[in-house]
């Protein structure tokens, strides 16, 4: 979450007057993340989050994101609840941008996840996948395997400038992924961005999931692969199979994986690593000088991609095929 748009006090007060959330006492911008402008609001009725959606989030897709959060809350998933204004609308406008207010979620993210955190994550991810089964709206994954080639082509020259020879390596990897990608796995609504900073804990217990603005319809096992990459590597680049086993076993206790999903896991993990490697490369190559948010380092996802390329079977993640 980041602050890109400053909001004049009088505009904010007029906007909040259309909601029944009490009188504003104080607010502050939140300088994290890369997508939207976010503010924490303190009113005499409680604490809330205000989000102004910047240009990377299409306004036409906001009903999906907000509707999904509302649906998941109704199904017992702990995530921010969109607050409706007095007209019953979840989406408004502020500072010439689409804007929404959501409930405040208690908890903090963990910087160094342990196996016990991965157990909590696996269980919550499976519950999310099952809870989204009857959600009526759908959103295509714009960053699926079919989108990686165009993304790569758009920054190929910059990739070789970043690391000579890397473009050729990624070109070959993309050919393999495109040819072998499984397209008939069980699918539905996935989070698609469940990094540790998007998962809150109180003590060792998971207290909620946030940041659903990459959520889409895709394979459930691909969402698992994203979590393998985001949660199961150490700072030195090594893979922690204990964390992976904890994550996967906890998931399967809630939603058992089909044999095809288990078999596809190494390829899905490669694809997940490729997706985040490419977006990080793109953001680094196209990073404006003096921009507020520092781009994330692509190298860690290159290391992860190369690791998964060497995984011969699901046993490499602690699963039996």
Curated annotation (Swiss-Prot):
Pathway: Amino-acid biosynthesis; L-threonine biosynthesis; L-threonine from L-aspartate: step 4/5. Pfam families: APH. Its EC number is 2.7.1.39. It catalyses: L-homoserine + ATP = O-phospho-L-homoserine + ADP + H(+). GO terms for biological process: threonine biosynthetic process. GO terms for molecular function: ATP binding; homoserine kinase activity. It comes from the Bacteria. InterPro entries: Aminoglycoside_PTrfase, Homoserine_kinase_II, Kinase-like_dom_sf, Pseudomonas-type_ThrB. The keyword Kinase applies. CDD domains: HomoserineK_II. Keywords: Amino-acid biosynthesis, ATP-binding, Kinase, Nucleotide-binding, Threonine biosynthesis, Transferase. Belongs to the pseudomonas-type ThrB family. NCBIfam families: PRK05231.1 (NF003558), thrB_alt (TIGR00938). This is Homoserine kinase. It comes from Parvibaculum lavamentivorans (strain DS-1 / DSM 13023 / NCIMB 13966). The gene is thrB.
